[in-house]
A protein has these predicted regions:
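C-terminal "cap" of GNAT-fold acetyltransferases
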Residues: 2-10, 125-166
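Acetyl-CoA-dependent GNAT
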Residues: 4-94, 99-100, 112-114, 118, ...
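Glycine-rich ATP-binding loop(s) of histidine-kinase-like ATPases
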Residues: 103
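Conserved G/P- and acidic residue-centered "switch" motifs that form tight phosphate/ATP-binding loops
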Residues: 106
Length: 166
């Protein structure tokens, strides 16, 4: 198992093509997998709903008010996460994805640690997220990192809402 210290997390600012290319691939994989798990499989990114395609093709605009974090092992983008700007003392974590070939190597933990630090530095007292109930490995990771299930703010069924202090 690779130690998570080998993972480097950077905040994506739209400044380099290599990071952007890696981010687009990660977001594409995230959305295609999520749609398939929801029973709404699509063959390629161009078949995704407009709002998801916009995140892939123009993340600078889609996440204009948010921090986009990208994890690297060497020169390879292996994970991503979006953390929203704090509102009412709370930030939300979205789009956490680790390339399946790099899972179990601390990538998600490194991204979440960077997200917690970013949220705290920007005035958040808590972070929250929602996760599909069938993603039991993700739910277990969040629980290990101190998240607890809370009342849902989501209207979509099968989403588990969780939060923790930063």
């Amino acid at each position: 198992m690779t130690d998570h210290r080998e993972v480097v997390v950077v905040r994506w600012r739209g400044q380099t093509a290599s990071v952007e290319d890696g981010l687009a691939a990660l977001l594409t994989a995230y959305h295609l997998r999520t749609e398939a798990e929801k029973g709404e499989a699509v063959a390629e990114a161009s078949d995704l709903p407009d709002r998801y395609r916009a995140e892939i093709t123009d993340p600078w605009t889609a996440f204009a008010d948010d921090a986009v974090l990208v994890a690297f092992q060497g020169d390879t983008a292996v994970g991503c996460l979006v953390v929203t700007s704090p509102s009412e003392g709370r930030s939300e974590i979205k789009r956490l994805w680790t390339d399946p070939g790099f899972r179990g190597r601390g990538v998600a933990s490194a991204l979440l640690g960077a997200a917690f630090a970013h949220a705290a530095e920007n005035g958040a007292e808590t972070v929250r997220l929602s996760v599909w109930e069938w993603r039991s490995d993700a739910v277990a990771l969040y629980e290990r990192l101190g998240f607890t299930v809370t009342e849902s703010w989501e209207e979509r069924k099968q989403l588990v809402s969780m939060q923790r202090a930063v």
